[in-house]
Amino acid sequence: MDYKESLLLPKTDFPMRGNLPQNEPVKYKQWDEKKVYEKMKKNRVGCPSFTLHDGPPYANGNIHIGHALNKILKDIINKFHYFEGKSIRYVPGWDCHGLPIEQKVEEKIGSEKKKELPKSKLRQLCRDHATKFVEIQKDEFKKLGVIADWENPYLTMDFKFEANIYRELCAIAKQGLLIQRSKPVYWSWAAQTALAEAEVEYEDKTSPSIYVAFEMSNESKAIHGLENKKAAFVIWTTTPWTLPANTGISLHPVEMYVLTSDGYIVAKALYSKLKEEAVINGEIVTEFEPFMFESNIAINPLNGRTSKIVLGDHVMMDSGTGAVHTAPGHGEDDYKVGLRYNLDVIMPVDAYGKYDETIVREKLFKDTNKYLGLNVFKANELILEELGSALLKRVDIRHSYPHCWRTHTPIIFRATKQWFISIDDKYGNKNNTLRENALEVVENLKFYPEWGRNRLKAMLEGRPDWCISRQRDWGVPIAFFRNKKTDEIIFDEKVLNYTAMIFEQKGCDAWYDLEIKELLYPGSGLNPDDLEKTLDILDVWFDSGSTQNAVLRSRNYDAGTFPADMYLEGSDQHRGWFQSSLLTTLASSEIAPYKSILTHGFTVDEKGEKMSKSKGNVVAPDKVIKEYGSEILRLWVAMSDYQSDLKISDNILKQNGELYRKIRNTARFLLANIDDLEEIIDVSKMGPLDKWILNKAKKVFDEIEAAFNVYEFSKGLNKLNNFLVVDLSGIYLDVCKDRLYCDDKKDIHRLASQSAMALIAKKLISTLACILTYTMDELLEFAPAFIKDGCEDIFDFKKVELPVVESSLDESILLSAKEKFSEIKDALSKEKVIKSTLELMLYTNSEDILALDEVEASDWFLVSQVSKDKQNSDILGSFQIDGKDFEVYKATAHKCPRCWKFTANAEESLCKRCEEVIK
């Protein structure tokens, strides 16, 4: 007789295969139609809130794997807090102004046509370009399963947004921190604009490393009794092109200096090194304290101009000569020491990085004709020739040098008139500097990982004033009126407010389109003819730094609370958005914009190498989604230690695919075996093994939640994977199969195991909903009603807590006994003594095993019987655990044709249990 129909075999419509690439878009469309973001808001009315403020990606080009990592991690954290019961707000945004977009438009229309276009037309083309890529990227982000307020994103080019950026600028001006001055700044000659620190990237470059002698003037030699003797300061530089603008030589204020027998002056601390390198050859003749040279004069060998000897703390003793070539127009330290000593600031380089008429006017070269209009980097070799015998040594070195982030060309330091936010002027209620306020705030923030605190602190401690002006067309103008006669900037509050109002109504294009009389506040009492517009635009980092005001503090978006609970970006944003947002908020209102900062690393290939098209190791999100589905990408993010660089490749994605299948199959097995369960029974009615797995699950899921609470998702998922593979699938689900399939539908053993499985299934859905949202939604769709609990979809699902269950079992003894038994079983199988463990029975005098009832004990070892009585038959194997005996025998009863256990009284007859079930 075939008893298969009488078995309660697993049954579920939940598919074994996810078919993620096909099913995810369908599911997301359903979510969109149901407006799940709005539903999430309604579901958490009156609940504690969590606000993650989105750092805006740039609206240019398709998203790359770094974007996917960032957005998925944000989505996981938002959903984690949501499923924990919090009300979340997530307004996505885009950075829409700036050089990259302007360059793309220029590439499209050509540089000549760009020059002919009215500024308003060019700006419209830039706006169109940004709008196009906002829509493209929005669609790409949705494909990652990200839930957000996609209907109401923030765009930095929206009129109201531009007005609020401008208002933030005005608030900073009101605090007295906005200053305009001529100062050396990072300058991209390829893009013809100033750059902020965050727009500078370091790449390797080959430069001439040169040592040059500056002979002391006769008057200065006379002061030291060196008349008619050679005495020259030796400077070291890797930028020969800056030598024409030299106006000083900086010495360390306390280090000793020496004059050598061959007539050169260097720091005593560096003398031996310089002699070893054959820069100088003479012995030490005289020692000097540095103050003895202060305000002495040396002669620039390139042009015969004077160079004042000054003292500066910036002079280092780890390299060079201890005598630093000082050109205040070409460096921050040079500029600062130049201010103290009133050194001339000479700037002979134009916006295109070429020598201009200044070299003629100031006689910076003996023959200016061959340098006029020449790119400074191309001038290096000519300058070295002109130095003649003053060039003591030249070595070409490969070193890290600042480059423009967009054009990837080496930049220069160039003194120009720019707008700055002062970092070290006192202001506000505390009468602190912006730097002091920022450093104080950083001490009170939470950082994930913790090392981010010191990194941000170090950058704030060392940063210069923030140069916020750019000489380009596509951006928010620094829209002030200047008095033509007095050069005074008009900071009248009513005038500024009126400009902001116009920007809100017409956009900041109005600054270019309208006449001054149309832009000027009617009641200002100012004559439009006396005024001119300032035409620089704002650094895009100021745009993104202002999002805290334009998004979180304005009433234009339902974006959550201010300050935000979290900012989350790549680790490069310690020098970017984390700083720009902090500095703008503190400068305008002395408040920190965020309570915590989480940073992630960069994406690299499986060898840890940077991705590039030339290497062919780029992993495109779109390709991954089409091949694997976004769930696998989301699992990769969650399983990676994002605090360092994240490796990704086809192999790594396949490994995550395997993990996904394990999770899916385990979940499917749980669903299939609780299909006919009507309600979860009380824990008190469960057996020891059911209580053991629930006790184990409770501990594991509590550990997972603790890890998730500090955003250590990989740690939590590794614990989950271990539990699913080892404890749940490897042991519990295996030992339950007999009772699930063969017991009566209402048998207490079966109901207890089903109930334990149902509780674990609910907790699994609750825990993984933030990561595998598509799959958990699908799982819920096929789950029994008592798990759904009235939920329409996963976004209605509430946090599940497993019951606290005391387990009396000694897990270590049970597991050790199971392991030892498995060794004997494997040997018997290998020797073909048995085909199945059900052919065996086990004797033991272990109280821990006998504490289980007979059914649970035999199920634990997957044998037909566990007895406290020794058998008379042959012992097939034995072992001891904790001093207790275990003996393995062949089962003496007959095989039951229904459950296959050797517990039947006669051949081909049913065992007692199966007989009762069939009746």
Curated annotation (Swiss-Prot):
A motif ('HIGH' region) lies at residues 57-67. The lineage of its organism: Bacteria, Pseudomonadati, Campylobacterota, Epsilonproteobacteria, Campylobacterales. The gene is ileS. L-isoleucyl-5'-AMP binds at E569. Zn(2+) binds at C896, C899, C911, C914. It comes from Aliarcobacter butzleri (strain RM4018) (Arcobacter butzleri). A motif ('KMSKS' region) lies at residues 610-614. This is Isoleucine--tRNA ligase. Keywords: Aminoacyl-tRNA synthetase, ATP-binding, Cytoplasm, Ligase, Metal-binding, Nucleotide-binding, Protein biosynthesis, Zinc. PANTHER family: ISOLEUCINE--TRNA LIGASE, MITOCHONDRIAL (PTHR42765:SF1), SOLEUCYL-TRNA SYNTHETASE (PTHR42765).
